[in-house]
Regions:
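Short amphipathic alpha-helical segment within the helicase RecA-like ATPase core
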Residues: 1-171
Length: 171
């Protein structure tokens, strides 16, 4: 799985899904909400999405957008570094379940990009046991934040090494 950092706008990208992590009690950026047809704000207003850690809501067919799906990922009440790690892993697993080839994860500038890259890499791990597995559908994760590509590479490499160790232990 390829993990990259992109500092531009998500609309510039050709991705199957966009993951938007949100803290409990927060609202979606007004411009982003308007661009997504007001659907994220509606999910929050109706209480269908609360922002609770581990929460995930899926929006299908965003109007006038190349993005097919938008995932709202809950960060909990006071997001810390570990929450960005968990949100990235959850976004990758949700994208895989929806059979998306690529997913962009919207991160604020103060988020830890390396932990998000590690979380995305950990999110693709599946215990293999002795059975043959279907190919992993997610090929690309794009972290929408500022930073150098070496940060994402370090997180990806760490996740690959840990996942390899997990596989060796399972044998």
């Amino acid at each position: 799985m390829n993990i990259t950092i992109h500092s531009g706008n998500w609309e510039e990208l050709d991705v199957d899904a966009l993951a938007v992590p949100l803290a409990k009690g927060s609202t979606v950026d007004a411009a982003l909400d308007a661009r997504l047809g007001g659907l994220p704000g509606e999910l929050i207003d109706t209480g269908e999405f609360t922002g609770k850690a581990g929460a995930c809501s899926l929006i299908h067919r965003v109007p006038d957008s190349a993005v097919k799906r938008v995932f709202l990922i809950g960060l909990g009440e006071a997001p810390m570094a570990r929450h960005w790690f968990a949100a990235a892993g959850q976004a990758v697993r949700a994208a895989a379940k929806a059979k998306c080839r690529s997913v962009a994860l919207l991160l604020p500038p103060d988020a830890c990009a390396r932990l998000a890259a590690e979380g995305a890499g950990f999110g693709q791990h599946r215990p293999s046991g002795y059975k043959e597995q279907k190919p992993w559908p997610v090929e690309e994760v794009i972290l929408l934040t500022t930073g150098d590509q070496s940060i994402a590479d370090a997180g990806r490499i760490t996740a690959e090494c840990v996942n390899l160790a997990r596989e060796l232990v399972e044998i």
